[in-house]
Amino acid sequence: MKKAVFTGAAVALVTPFHKDGSINYGKLEELIDYQIENSTDAIVVCATTGESPTLSYEEHEQIVRRCVEYAAGRVPVIAGTCSNDTKNALKLSNDAERAGADGLLMVTPYYNKTSQAGLIEHFNFIADRVSTPIILYNVPSRTGLNIKPETYYELSKHKNIVATKEANGDISALAQTVKLCGDELTIYSGNDDQITAFMSLGARGVISVLSNIAPMAVHDMVKTYLDGDTAASTELQLKYLDLCSSLFSDVNPIPVKEAMNMMGMDVGSCRLPLTQIQPQGKGKRRGGANIDRRRRSSGGASPLSE
């Protein structure tokens, strides 16, 4: 059995920006403290929610290094090392490894895509050249490419490929993956509205967008399930379904950043091509006050501004 990078709730952390678009490293440290104080079990930086496609190599390396240094071993730090080019993904992975990341989150190649055989070659090529554990990331709604259960099985044979963040939403495929891979591949839910469903099939936690604004609630949702109180976990899952939906009323991370700013967390806007939340998104999204009310009802800590 391979050792899991973490068990519990990891936050897919936003990248805070100043008004001029530069990275707000002081705010990044505040967000790290806020997450740790509210029981988050691991921190994921430079992934989708962290706007990785708009980060330069230098910014990516600096975010990972600063996060590792500031977290100082309090929780594992996982770096997104996503690219649709194998050599670039390897460079990002090498940079993150040198910076001290505890894990690498690696999405399937997007746009140019590949075959299932190509996926195996792509991930194994990188896994052969790093020693840091790799968490695969399957999100076909963004990449246009799905990792099949049989492909997971082949990838799970590599000693450095230890887990996956599964966000395709297909519970039947998840069950087949668990059946094929067993303890050789740790499963993390990539969808906040499917945490308990995934855990019923053996998942060990979640990599969460919701944790940016409700870290204690997401932590409790996972912990109660792992502790055997599935009823309490399910109750929390159902309680937060509407909030989960509101955070995906527009392209992630536009809504969660707007919610954080409304709560006084001052994380700034997204970089282009992402824009402000659109009118149709505003129509579907709960107001900032309601998001804050739902978050407070979880028993979590107050926003950073308070």
Residue ranges and their predicted role:
Residues 128-129, 142-248:
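Catalytic alpha/beta core domains of metabolic enzymes, predominantly
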Residues 28, 60, 64, 89, ...:
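A general structural signal for well-ordered alpha-helical segments in protein cores
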Residues 85, 191-192, 278:
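Helix N-cap/beta->alpha junction signal
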Residues 62, 66-71, 95, 99, ...:
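Alpha-helical structural signal in soluble globular domains
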Residues 2-5, 38, 176-179, 185, ...:
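Catalytic cores of TIM-barrel enzymes
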Residues 138, 160-161, 271-272:
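Glycine-rich phosphate-binding "P-loop"
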Residues 5-16, 34, 38-40, 200-203, ...:
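C-terminal alpha-helical cap/extension of soluble enzyme domains
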Residues 2-11, 15-144:
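Active-site beta->alpha loop and helix N-cap motifs at the rims of alpha/beta catalytic domains
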